Each structure stands twice: as structure tokens, then as C-alpha cells.
Amino acid sequence: MTNRLKEKYVKEMTPALIEKFNYTSSMQVPKIEKIVLNMGVGDAVSNAKNLDKAVEELGLIAGQKPLITKAKKSIAGFRLREGMPIGAKVTLRGERMYDFLDKLVNVSLPRVRDFHGVSAKSFDGRGNYTLGVREQLIFPEIDYDKVDRVRGLDVVIVTTSNTDEEARELLTQFGMPFAK
């Protein structure tokens, strides 16, 4: 069974993007390469159990096991040593990536309080989009009663497009609700 968004991309979006940006080949059409979810857990320095809970929640959200990220440098002000675990990340590709994007756009983002669309300024200049989520409770897999504390996470959508304009059009066609 192929994913609904992937099917839409192949059948509807590719021809529309070729027409809009006058590509000569279908291989020039931008596509989503990967989605990276990152959760920095600053208080993991003092209490390692916080990191375990964050890893568990990120695993539920993404549907695959997160990688624990470690500190690159020691910072005395934060009581941080090089190599200490301070966060978790997940890289989604293929089917899981499309599943997550579908869930993010159609279920999770509409659950954000006072939601007026995501910022259109969060592109990096090379066609990648970054979105900060303030609380993990917007995802349907997270059970409100089992959450010990509210944590945010970063969602980075990496595309093959060369410009922000192309990436924005791609994400808009996928249904990303940009603020007007």
C-alpha cells in the first residue's frame, strides 16, 4: 500500500511543479529528502531519567527508535562535559517520512492552541524548512496523563529544491498551512 501523500506527489504535484517552474525533466522537480525530529533535553545533565522519557516520547511520535545526541564540547557554565547525552533525534525517510508529514499537517498542527499557520520565514535559503513545536502534546500518540513535563521539539524538512520559493510551493502543495 503506497502512501496517500506520495501518490499525490507523483500524480498531481509533479506535473503542477513542472508547469509552474518550467522544468525540462521530472528529475528536476524538488522532493522531500528527509524529515529530522530533534529534541534537546537540557535538564538531562542533572537528571538522566528526563532523557529516557524524552527518548520514549520521540520514539512514539516518530515510530522509530531515536538516536541519543551527545555534547560536542564541555561548557562549564552549564555543568556540561563533552560526550554527555543531552538530547535525541530521529531521521525519517521513505514511507515513515510521508506518514509523519501527513500526520503533522492534518492532525497535529490543527491541535496547536491559537494556530494561525506556520511561519513562512523559516526557510534556510537552500530550500529546507524548520519548524519548532512548543509542546509534544499536539501529537496523537502522546497520552496527556503520562506526560511528566511539556517538551518541545524541532522538525526539519529537508528538500532537494535549490530555492526557498520552490520548497515553499512544494510544502504548500503537500498541505503545509503557511500563515498569510
Curated annotation (Swiss-Prot):
Keyword Chloroplast carried by entry: no
One Pfam family of this chain: Ribosomal_L5_C
GO cellular component term of the entry, any: ribonucleoprotein complex
Any single GO BP term: translation
UniProt keyword terms in alphabetical order: Ribonucleoprotein, Ribosomal protein, RNA-binding, rRNA-binding, tRNA-binding
GO MF assignments: rRNA binding; structural constituent of ribosome; tRNA binding
Gene3D superfamilies per record: 3.30.1440.10
Family recorded in the similarity comment: Belongs to the universal ribosomal protein uL5 family.
Record note on quaternary structure: Part of the 50S ribosomal subunit; part of the 5S rRNA/L5/L18/L25 subcomplex. Contacts the 5S rRNA and the P site tRNA. Forms a bridge to the 30S subunit in the 70S ribosome.
PANTHER family: 60S RIBOSOMAL PROTEIN L11-RELATED (PTHR11994)
Functional summary from the UniProt entry: This is one of the proteins that bind and probably mediate the attachment of the 5S RNA into the large ribosomal subunit, where it forms part of the central protuberance. In the 70S ribosome it contacts protein S13 of the 30S subunit (bridge B1b), connecting the 2 subunits; this bridge is implicated in subunit movement. Contacts the P site tRNA; the 5S rRNA and some of its associated proteins might help stabilize positioning of ribosome-bound tRNAs.
NCBIfam families assigned to the protein according to its UniProt record, in alphabetical order: PRK00010.1 (NF000585)
Protein name: Large ribosomal subunit protein uL5
Organism in which the protein naturally occurs: Latilactobacillus sakei subsp. sakei (strain 23K)
